[in-house]
Structures are given as C-alpha cells and as structure tokens.
Amino acid sequence: MMKKDRAQKSTTREYIMKLIYQININKEDFETLEDKVDNFLKDNSEHIINRYKELALQYSKNTNLKLEDTEIEDVIDKKYINTVCKALKENHDKIDELINKHAKNWTVDRMPKVDVSILRLSVCEILYLDTPNKVSINEAVELAKIYCDDKSPKFINGILGSVVDEIGK
C-alpha cells in the first residue's frame, strides 16, 4: 500500500504544480485557486489517472498491480490539495518574497514560469505542510527534471536548500 500512497502523492503534487502554473501564465489571482481545483481535476482526469498508473507501476515491485478500475478519487489526495490551496492563497506574497530573497540575481517575475510554480509549491510545503523538507526538495527537483531545462534542477535545489537553512527546520 505504501507504494500506492507515494504514487498518489507524486501525482497530486505534479498536477497541483500544473494548476499553479496555469494560474501563473493566465495572470490570475491565488484567491481563485481553490475554486479552480475541481474543474482542473475534471478536465485533466484522464491524464492524471494515466500518470498515477505510470508512477504506481514504477514505484511498485508488484508486477500484478490492479489498476484497471482506477478513478480520479483514488489517485488524488484532496486533503493535500486543499491544504496547499489554502496556504498559497493566504501566503503567496510571503512565499514569493522568500523565493526572491534566495534566488541570487533573480525574481519570480523573471524566472521561467514552471520553475516558479515548482518553487512556490515546494516552499509552501516546507513552510506550511508536514512534508519532510528532504522529500519536498527531492520532489521539486524531480519535477524540474521532467518539466524544466537542464539548469533548473540545480537552481531549484539551491534555492530550496537556502530557504530550509534560513528557517532552520
């Protein structure tokens, strides 16, 4: 069961990052984040379920994993999404300030939007969720390897490491 939970958490994290990205490129306010979740999940449910299945198989040693009847409710951690949305809505300015402070010679306005989305999610986790810092940083770096250019994983890792050092968690 543990591997399924890991696949669920990774899938959820990946798609909340995509929602943050969508809000960023559409120049929408984080006040609307919670309102957009259900439509975003519904519109992307097939992709989300397929990604979950891919990760569940990748993380599992069980080659007979039963995934045929997988529903969106099985693959998304709604509680995690709601917690992230609430924290981002209430604290996005503080999160961006922290990112700007630790991104030497960069600001969130000048960084690639995907990098910013990954950083916002990870800093949010580090500050406001019970996710272990190492897990949050590792997941952010893994997302950067998939969605960003070659320099981004190191860049993101450096910023997040610096944030963790500052807050002393």
Swiss-Prot record:
GO cellular component: cytosol
UniProt GO BP: DNA-templated transcription termination; transcription antitermination
MF annotations from Gene Ontology: RNA binding
Keywords assigned by UniProt, alphabetized: RNA-binding, Transcription, Transcription antitermination, Transcription regulation
Record has DNA damage as a keyword: no
Superkingdom, natural source: Bacteria
UniProt record similarity statement: Belongs to the NusB family.
Role: Involved in transcription antitermination. Required for transcription of ribosomal RNA (rRNA) genes. Binds specifically to the boxA antiterminator sequence of the ribosomal RNA (rrn) operons.
Protein name: Transcription antitermination protein NusB
Protein's gene: nusB
